[in-house]
Design a protein with these regions (language model features):
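ATP-dependent adenylation/nucleotidyltransferase module used to activate substrates
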Residues: 1-136, 141-162, 203, 218, ...
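AMP-forming adenylation/ATP pyrophosphatase catalytic core
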Residues: 131-163, 167-275
Length: 275
């Protein structure tokens, strides 16, 4: 018997004839795409994958490949986030503007392909976090069907595993802008430095990793139970990250924590960005 939440997701999708799924290759949007394909049929689903300077080419390619493997019609597009001054200078409002640009592009492609709606992978957990993108989603008329079906991250993992989706345990990724302090100019050089550093650390077995940047200092965040493993390789890691351009390399002893850079924002600033 299907769970109530699966049935709710199917019901939410069934009201549309043809949909555009904003597909990142992450577990959330993968569950949306899988459900849309099963509910509406391949001919009524378009998966769109966006590439930009703030995400790795590897993530883009993997997302394109995954959508094709799932049997979806897939379209790639490119977003020039750094053309927006708020994003380029990493203002507190940058997350809103990134999502605004994203949903506007999705709407343009939706209209061009005669789709009824843009669907994204926002889950219920996102409502309890600092997510300025929710406001942009509402403004641009996109629908978060997982939220409509009252689905949380734990539900998503269960649904993905039960459906046999290859990325059911995939580590979440995020725009590389989240590695930089607010009000810091984002440059191609700085972005590439972070991407190279994180790719190197992943190659050593640290699947969940963030290299936060404070001027020319790298602050590595990994899972707390892996810190000893990192320390055992500290000299090689220090040399490699300095080779990439950092002057100093440190480890955050609290371990990985999503949204760490948001801790510097006051409650008033957060409220102004999401309300």
């Amino acid at each position: 018997m299907e769970s109530a939440k699966k049935l709710a997701l199917t019901a939410a999708l069934s009201q549309y004839n043809k949909v555009l799924v904003a597909f990142s290759g992450g577990i959330d949007s993968t569950v949306v795409l899988d459900a849309a394909l099963k509910t509406l049929g391949k001919e009524n689903v378009l998966a769109v994958v966006a590439n930009s300077d703030l995400f790795t080419d590897e993530e883009y390619t993997k997302a394109m490949d995954l959508a094709q493997e799932m049997g979806a019609t897939v379209l790639g597009t490119t977003l020039d986030y750094l053309s927006n001054d708020d994003i380029k200078n990493n203002r507190a409002s940058s997350w809103y503007w990134m999502k605004k640009m994203f949903y506007q592009k999705m709407n343009e492609l939706k209209d061009n392909s005669n789709c009824d709606v843009v669907l994204d992978g926002m889950i219920m957990d996102d409502k309890n976090d600092f997510r300025p993108g929710l406001r942009a989603c509402d403004e641009e008329g996109a629908v978060s069907v997982l939220q409509v079906a009252n689905i949380y991250k734990s539900d998503v993992r269960d649904m993905a595993r039960e459906a046999g989706l290859s990325n059911w345990n995939k580590v979440a990724s995020c725009s590389v802008s989240s590695r930089f302090e607010y009000d810091t100019e984002l440059t191609v050089e700085g972005i590439q430095r972070v991407m190279k550093s994180e790719a190197y650390l992943r190659s050593l077995g640290f699947a969940t990793v963030r290299v936060r940047v404070q001027n020319k200092l790298a602050r590595i965040e990994i899972m707390a139970d892996q810190i000893n493993d990192l320390v055992a390789q500290m000299f090689a890691i220090n040399d490699k990250l300095q080779e990439f351009g950092f002057d100093y390399v440190t480890v955050d002893l609290e371990g990985f924590k999503s949204g760490r850079m948001n801790e510097s924002l006051t409650a008033d600033v957060k409220s102004a960005l999401v309300d």
